[in-house]
Each structure stands twice: as structure tokens, then as C-alpha cells.
């Protein structure tokens, strides 16, 4: 995540651990979940944060946050979420993406859509490793 970041949406926030960590670092955080049971647990876990129920980026307004984190889902799902909300996605300065699979296909899609891969790293969790991408520079039309 860019060091200068001030606001972020954690899309598909799950149990809220990442959102809580980001808020503790001083960022303004919007945490989202698409399923009502998961959203209810998120609201209980993070009563002090802005938690929203809805699909992907659809619960955000263009320019409301500087960037988004999409982690713990497949590359195809990440691409679908970004593509489904072009006004919101086009207003983002950056994305941090951690696809569970199909990272290379996601990178190809992002580049074709006008995004630039600024950093690529590997995160290790137990026996598994995952690609982590910092994506910026969407060509706004």
C-alpha cells in the first residue's frame, strides 16, 4: 500500500482484521461485505468503522477513497469487481490486489484495461504463497 495513503476500502473485509489494522495505522477505512451474515459479523467486530453491505465497489462513490484492497478471492472475481464499477475504479489512485489464483490472467487483464503494475510480491501464509500486486495509473477517459 502506498505510504502516503489516507483512505482505503477493504472490499470483502471478512472478519475485519485487515480493516482494523489499517484503521490503527490512521487510515480512514470503509469495510465492505456482500453477504448479510458476514456483514453482520463485520459490524459487530468493527463498530467504530464505516461498514457497508453490497457488491464490490458498488457501495462506494467515485473519489470517496484513494484506493482499495481486494484480497482472498480469485483473479477472475477481482477483475469482475473492478470492471463492474468503472466510475469508482476510474477514480481510484491505487489498488492492492491479492488473488488466490489466476494472478497472471489478472495482470494481463489489468494491463489491457490501462492499469500499471507498480509492485509485485509474494506473501506466504503457512504452506501457501500468494501474489500481491500494487496497481496504479489507470488511464482515465
Give each language-model segment a name:
Residues 1-5:
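Conserved alpha-helix/loop element of class I SAM-dependent methyltransferases that forms part
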Residues 6-14:
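Conserved class I S-adenosyl-L-methionine
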Residues 14, 73-76:
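Short glycine-rich anion-binding loops that position phosphate/pyrophosphate groups of nucleotides
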Residues 15-27:
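Conserved SAM-binding loop of SAM-dependent methyltransferases across substrates and taxa
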Residues 28-33:
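Conserved SAM-binding motif I beta-strand of class I
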Residues 36, 40-62:
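S-adenosyl-L-methionine
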Residues 59, 64, 76-141:
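Class I S-adenosyl-L-methionine
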Residues 65-72:
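Short SAM/SAH-binding signature in class I
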